[in-house]
């Protein structure tokens, strides 16, 4: 049987890919296409020695994109495969599975129909995910494909955690409730931290903090998600690069009224113009904001304080939801790489039993590590996420 799995993540104008050899989970090839349907589209790939190569190519739509990825994967010089027959299956990141999907599934016509019914909930992402699936079907009709849903891990939340206190018919008519995102990441790191520490997930209360350009926190009890900070859409919860996170609904209607904004314009303000970028007016990139704060920019300092405070509040809330916490872990671009932000997140959590080893924390960048002191009641860890490997493993298990 064929142990090579291709993982695809199709966005509205991009396709990321990673090719795994599942005999040892090694990455054989990786890269991505950007600016699909726009001028200047290109494929960026990482060669086996770690160097990056950019190939410009006109990619008008997703099928052409997938075709070009297949072409590069089997290229005599650049490719990792002799032929596409070496591929065992393709795994897809699917963003919004609604209430229909609580685990990964083999993509059949029936499944795709059910997934299409969730388009309303993720109008940007889901149609792009479908384009990727259809492109693969068109080019390799017989290859098995698997869908791994960003929302699936959170489907174990109890109703009192996922319902909003809106008129109940809003839930009945439109499925308005908390769904949560980054589920594949939260699932991976919550499992991985238990392996890393050599503990059984049963009886463990874990708070997983996926902090990057988008950010979400989950409460994981006995290996199952019981709450998460993102909601119906990825807009709720933490302050993010360009997203507001939690904001008073009354402020939303007030701004729409004062500025004369249509719903789509208001959505754009909340999703693309808010967060760190909105508060600082400088950048959505934490590295730039941290640098500017060190140089004395007051709005960058404010944004960092707000950002860390929001993370800390959610950690406190989820400790309350689980009657305590055993493990807090950080992952994502900021969580894995920004030691000073991790310190800010943990600052003042002594009451919870968190004691950070500051010297150790300062040495950790993108590695698995324990960053709490040996006598800390709560174990604090950094666990780099690997959503693609999780997708590849799920795909292997289903084909």
Predicted feature locations:
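N-terminal glycine/serine-rich phosphate-binding loop of ATP-dependent small-molecule kinases
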Residues: 1-98
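Glycine-rich beta-strand-to-loop/alpha-helix junction loops that act as flexible
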Residues: 11, 92-95, 211-213, 325, ...
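Phosphate/pyrophosphate-binding loops at sites that engage ATP/ADP/AMP, CoA/4′-phosphopantetheine
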Residues: 72-87, 193-200, 315-326
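Short beta-strand-loop/turn "lid" adjacent to the catalytic site in phosphate-handling enzymes
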Residues: 73, 77-125, 146, 152-161
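Glycine-rich phosphate-binding loop of actin/hexokinase-like ATP-binding domains
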Residues: 153-258
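Catalytic phosphate/nucleotide-handling subdomain of diverse soluble enzymes
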Residues: 221, 227-259, 268, 332-363
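Adenine-nucleotide phosphate-binding core of ATP-dependent small-molecule kinases
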Residues: 268, 275-279, 286-321
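Internal helix-turn-beta structural module
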Residues: 301, 305-326, 335-399
